[in-house]
Every structure is written in C-alpha cells, then in structure tokens.
Swiss-Prot record:
Keyword Membrane: yes
Note: Clone B10.A was isolated from a cytotoxic T lymphocyte. Clone 2C was isolated from a cytotoxic T lymphocyte.
Species this chain originates from: Mus musculus (Mouse)
Keyword list, A-Z: Glycoprotein, Immunoglobulin domain, Membrane, Receptor, Transmembrane, Transmembrane helix
UniProt protein name: T-cell receptor beta-2 chain C region
Organism taxonomic ancestry: Eukaryota, Metazoa, Chordata, Craniata, Vertebrata
TM ranges: 147-168
Amino acid sequence: EDLRNVTPPKVSLFEPSKAEIANKQKATLVCLARGFFPDHVELSWWVNGKEVHSGVSTDPQAYKESNYSYCLSSRLRVSATFWHNPRNHFRCQVQFHGLSEEDKWPEGSPKPVTQNISAEAWGRADCGITSASYHQGVLSATILYEILLGKATLYAVLVSGLVLMAMVKKKNS
C-alpha cells in the first residue's frame, strides 16, 4: 500500500425518511464513510452514549470507489417512537486505522494517524398532528362543550326552581 495516499474518511449521518416513519413506523438512520484509504476501518453505532448492536446492518466490507478511495455504509433501525424522542442521541463512529508513529510522513502536512471520526443526530420531536387526530380532537372538544353546556343549563334550571320555590314560600307566609 502506498502510504502517501493514506486518507481518513469523511463521515455523514442521514436521518430517516418521513415516508418510512409514516408507512412502517420504523426509522432507519444511514451512516456513510467515504474517501478513506486504506480500507482499515471499524464502524459502530452509539445511542445515548452506549454502543448498540441490535438493529444494526453494516456492509460486509468496504467498497472500492477508486484506486485510493473506499466507502462503507451502515444502517441503524429503530422504532418511529424512539426516533421521535428528542432526548435520544445517535452517533455513528468510524475508527480509522491510519499511520503508526513509526511510519514516515512528509513534514508540513498532517499525519493521518489512527483516529475516531463521528457523525451524530438527535431524535426529532413529532407533534403527531394528522388529519385523523385533528378531527378526533375537534369531536372530543365538541362533545365536552355540549356536556358542559348541558350541565350549566341543568344548574340554571335547578337554581331557578329553588328561587321560585323560595318566592312562593315567602309569599304564602
């Protein structure tokens, strides 16, 4: 391998599609590490500071883009509810095994040593208002209003009856 071409990866994290969340109630985050050489990398997923393995699917090996460039992708699938919690923190970490201290490197440019490169995202809050939930809310509010109106009317009739009885009793005495 040509040590002059040693290059660390550029890591990107892509958030789940709204269509997948709506149709499948699942959320797939995609991590893409590109432009690295050589292909000595390890990719891991971290959620809320802990490494996770469940729901992870990583390419079996890095794909060669050109003579001195590789790429690797990985997916993390979680429930839509878990994704919609803004307290959840997702991180894709790529450990790049670059040059060792003994390897010669020209002075004046940064030496690509072994390092961790990450991309991260936070869960996205979803207000959850759909057409169906909006209509259900309007219906519930209407029913509640009618109950309160009926209760107020019943109270008014009851108070009026008591006042009328008190007036009749006072008139007769």
